[in-house]
Amino acid sequence: MKVILKQDVKKLGTAGEVKEVSDGYARNFLIPRGIAVEASKGHMKDLELQRKQEEERQQKLKEEAEELKQKLDNEKVVIYQKTGDEGKLFGSVTNKDVAEELKSKGYTVEKKKIEMEPIKSLGTHKVHVKLHPEVTVDIDVQVSEKK
């Protein structure tokens, strides 16, 4: 019997895949638990529609990420931190600090998308921002002394 998986199933497949399984496995386990539905023509059409919608959504997200990349390309972020005697920072500059500074400039970037090691010295540093799995941008972060 062919079924469409609604969830990921170990050793069988991932959600949205059409799989051939034994009748008993489908009727007694997968379908009653809501893990799968029978692969009828109606369900197959629904699956195709969902795939198209997901594709369009992903394309839209990628286009938005490309637009944001264009805006961030020449952006320079300046962060002021307290320093010690020899220019050493008290603490460090993290992705949270960079995200907050970008937010204050009108850009919405989640801190988890900013890939960086904590910055512990003054100067200009390159920071990698992953806007989308296929779209990344490097921005300059200048750490200056707070007076």
UniProtKB/Swiss-Prot annotation:
Q: Which NCBIfam families match?
A: L9
Origin, by domain of life?
Bacteria
Similarity-based family: Belongs to the bacterial ribosomal protein bL9 family.
GO CC term, one of those recorded? ribonucleoprotein complex
Protein role: Binds to the 23S rRNA.
- Which PANTHER family does the record cross-reference, listed alphabetically? 50S RIBOSOMAL PROTEIN L9 (PTHR21368)
Cite a single GO MF annotation: rRNA binding
Q: Which Gene3D superfamilies match?
A: Ribosomal protein L9, C-terminal domain, Ribosomal protein L9, N-terminal domain
What is the gene name? rplI
| InterPro entries per UniProt | Ribosomal_bL9, Ribosomal_bL9/RNase_H1_N, Ribosomal_bL9_bac/chp, Ribosomal_bL9_C, Ribosomal_bL9_C_sf, Ribosomal_bL9_N, Ribosomal_bL9_N_sf
Q: Which GO terms describe its biological process?
A: translation
The name under which this protein is listed is: Large ribosomal subunit protein bL9
UniProt keyword list: Ribonucleoprotein, Ribosomal protein, RNA-binding, rRNA-binding
Q: Which organism is it from?
A: Natranaerobius thermophilus (strain ATCC BAA-1301 / DSM 18059 / JW/NM-WN-LF)
- The answer to whether UniProt assigns keyword rRNA-binding to this entry is yes
Q: Name one Pfam family in it.
A: Ribosomal_L9_N
